[in-house]
């Protein structure tokens, strides 16, 4: 069985272990260009900064669970870490945490004639991302959005 085909199984197991350890699972990926292959798992604490102890706890529990699976009869390296702070927003948690912060939205196609929008993040729902631009609300369809990134506005003299 190819290692990449095990990814759904690993994601499910990692989610169960993360839930037991009261952590949020951020991502699971195989780095198969390494020998042995690396299983990289990123987690974050839902309320506090993610500690080394959080990562160690999850690593031990996940390693024990993986060792029980007959599909894991091969050598691999398990890496568990925190994703750190990215300046790109992607999850609901990111959008909630950075409400009111200045963001730069890039679209894949023009929206109202532009592909780059800046403003303070109001919120995101199922359909749109909302920005405050000088006191006016702007809705940008999520279907057009390529990225939403935190940025520091330059001060104008």
From Swiss-Prot:
Where in or outside the cell is it found? Answer: Cytoplasm
Keyword annotations of the record: Cytoplasm, Ribosome biogenesis
What is any one GO biological process for this UniProt entry?
Answer: translation
**Where does this protein chiefly localize?**
cytoplasm
Write down the SUPFAM superfamilies for this protein, in alphabetical order.
YhbC-like, C-terminal domain (SSF74942), YhbC-like, N-terminal domain (SSF75420)
Q: Which InterPro entries match?
A: Ribosome_maturation_RimP, RimP_C_sf, RimP_N, RimP_N_sf
Q: Where are the transmembrane segments?
A: none
Q: Which GO terms describe its cellular component?
A: cytosol
| Reported function | Required for maturation of 30S ribosomal subunits.
Its family remark reads: Belongs to the RimP family.
Which HAMAP family does this UniProt record tie to the protein?
RimP
Q: By what name is this protein known?
A: Ribosome maturation factor RimP
Q: Which organism is it from?
A: Thermosynechococcus vestitus (strain NIES-2133 / IAM M-273 / BP-1)
Q: What is the lineage of its organism?
A: Bacteria, Bacillati, Cyanobacteriota, Cyanophyceae, Acaryochloridales
């Amino acid at each position: 069985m190819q290692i990449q085909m095990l990814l759904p199984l690993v994601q499910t197991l990692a989610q169960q272990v993360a839930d037991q350890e009261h952590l949020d699972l951020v991502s699971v990926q195989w780095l198969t260009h390494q020998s042995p292959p690396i299983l990289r798992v990123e987690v974050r604490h839902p309320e506090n900064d993610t500690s080394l102890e959080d990562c160690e706890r999850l690593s031990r529990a996940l390693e024990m669970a993986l060792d029980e699976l007959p599909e894991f009869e091969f050598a691999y390296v398990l890496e568990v870490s925190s994703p750190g702070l990215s300046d790109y927003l992607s999850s609901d948690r990111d959008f909630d945490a950075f409400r009111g912060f200045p963001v730069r939205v890039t679209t894949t196609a023009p929206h109202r004639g532009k592909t780059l929008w800046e403003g303070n993040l109001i919120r995101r729902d199922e359909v749109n991302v909302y920005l405050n631009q000088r006191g006016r609300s702007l809705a940008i369809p999520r279907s057009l959005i390529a990225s939403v990134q935190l940025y520091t506005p330059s001060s104008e003299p």
